From Swiss-Prot:
An annotated GO BP: chaperone-mediated protein folding
PANTHER family linked: DNAJ HOMOLOG SUBFAMILY B MEMBER 2, SIMILAR TO DNAJ HOMOLOG SUBFAMILY B MEMBER 6 (HEAT SHOCK PROTEIN J2) (HSJ-2) (MRJ) (MDJ4)
InterPro entries tied to this protein: DnaJ_domain, DnaJ_domain_CS, DNJB2/6-like, J_dom_sf
A cellular component annotation (GO) from this entry: cytoplasm
Region of interest called Interaction with HSP70, as start-end residue ranges on this chain: 2-146
Gene3D superfamilies registered for this protein in UniProt: DnaJ domain (1.10.287.110)
Protein name: DnaJ homolog subfamily B member 6
Length: 242
């Protein structure tokens, strides 16, 4: 039987934040769109990770799971045994894509994957769950909070977000925009994310396009293309001048 703690790679005493971090990492790793050559296994892993997160991120479900295992969530302990469970008629897991979209709040998750954490390279710390965790930049990061999530009733989705922030004392200005759209089967999924930072007068723009399993990353400095990467492989550039 699958152990949800093992699925997420966390200890049984893991905190709620540990559970979120583990889900975020594994959901991005095993998303079927990122594994076009191994889609069957990816879909299975992606579903397991979503189920584990659904249970372990909810205190009540996690308590029942810790005491009775998955059978407790199914509403029975087997062998005619009986225990007090709020899921006596069985707990129904949601579509893993719905869990995924809700977790990322409608934002483009793959742009977050590219930067590991939004603007971590710029500011050196992570965004809190409501955007107010980081000192001095809470109002900037809070721009990301409250973005509408997408429910399972929609057969397709089209999402976008943008944000702008600056730190006067650091001489740095950052701007990020992202859009994602695709069908419910995610077969036509496409995401475009652009992140720009200005450091000491130099404008550095990173554009990332993911479409049907192919990733293209362009980095420009002051409008000049400096690097191009396709599916993780850097491409040779022909520049007229340096």
């Amino acid at each position: 039987m699958v152990d949800y703690y093992e699925v997420l790679g966390v200890q049984r005493h893991a905190s709620a934040e540990d559970i979120k971090k583990a889900y975020r990492k594994l959901a991005l790793k095993w998303h079927p769109d990122k594994n076009p050559e191994n889609k069957e296994e990816a879909e299975r892993k992606f579903k397991q990770v979503a189920e584990a997160y659904e249970v372990l991120s909810d205190a009540k479900k996690r308590d029942i799971y810790d005491r009775y295992g998955k059978e407790g969530l199914n509403g029975g302990g087997g062998g005619g045994s009986h225990f007090d469970s709020p899921f006596e008629f069985g707990f129904t897991f949601r579509n893993p894509e719905d869990v995924f979209r809700e977790f990322f709040g409608g934002r483009d998750p793959f742009s977050f994957d590219f930067f590991e954490d939004p603007f971590e390279d710029f500011f050196g710390h992570r965004r809190g769950p409501r955007g107010s965790r980081s000192r001095g930049t809470g109002s900037f990061f809070s721009t990301f909070s409250g973005f509408p999530s997408f429910g399972g009733a929609f057969p397709s989705f089209d999402a976008g977000f943008s944000s702008f922030g600056s730190l006067g004392h650091g001489g740095l200005t950052a701007f990020s925009s992202s859009s994602a759209f695709g069908g419910s089967g995610m077969g036509n999924y496409k995401s475009i994310s652009t992140s720009t930072k200005v450091v000491n007068g130099r404008k550095i723009t990173t554009k990332r396009i993911v479409e049907n399993g192919q990733e293209r990353v362009e980095v420009e400095e002051d409008g000049q293309l400096k690097s191009l990467t396709i599916n993780g492989k850097e491409q040779l550039l022909r520049l007229d001048n340096k």
